[in-house]
């Protein structure tokens, strides 16, 4: 199928979190994008202590990250069963050690085995830009500096809770080489923002088995030469460097891409 770029009329803005307390981070957001509510994905960055009482990504949500599939699977009518078909487990590292930095911020941490330092201070790949941020202002500054403009938009998923079976309703391409900001799975509120080259981001409209409609941020990697061959074969029965490989992005992350069609930022 032909993937169309998102237009202003086709943008679906997610429900935004209601923030009543004034914070410097939110004030800074409003100073750059007036009258644009802060997306729920970034609300943890306003917690005064910078620490949540539990891990932000629950075991049920891990399925959103662990299903790998082909780019040609992104078409209306395709069925996805999260955490079952083509799943490589709830905690995965699809790239080998030599390119570990490429995916440190994509795949979730096992708290008992990895630390924030493993994600934030590991070597980066060639042409990769990576920053860990613990404040909303820092994130805003990083993405604006990267794109050289405030005309950008943030896009995220809104997977329905306790739903694993979905049917694709529509697919929209939103951009290449997006900057991904992932909430790391620790109590301390830290987002890892990075750009991985040779990637394409999509918003996939899904319908759950109970009829609930949702949007899924999806990233396809076109350069898979560094992927772990055992995991890739287990999931898709292909070898690294042969075909693009895609995965969904869960609710605790967002993709920043240029906004060529609107004056104001719109968060999906």
Swiss-Prot record:
> Which stretch is the leader sequence?
1-25
Q: In which tissues is it expressed?
A: Expressed in seeds. Detected only in the embryo. In germinating seedlings, detected in roots, root caps, root hairs, vascular bundle, mesophyll cells and epidermal cells of the cotyledons and the hypocotyl.
SMART domains documented for this protein? BURP (SM01045)
| Record keyword Transport present | no
What keywords were assigned to this record?
A: Golgi apparatus, Signal
Q: Which InterPro entries would you find in this protein's record?
A: BURP, BURP_dom
Specify the domain of life of the species encoding this protein.
Answer: Eukaryota
The keyword Chloroplast belongs to this UniProt entry's keyword annotation: no
Listed under GO cellular component are: Golgi stack
Domain BURP as annotated: residue spans = 68-259
Tell me what else is known: Most abundant mRNA species from cotyledons at early stages of development, but the encoded protein does not accumulate in cotyledons. The USP gene family consists of roughly 10 to 20 members.
Purpose: Associated with the protein storage vacuole formation.
Q: What is this protein called?
A: Unknown seed protein USP
Recorded source organism is: Vicia faba (Broad bean)
The record's gene field reads USP
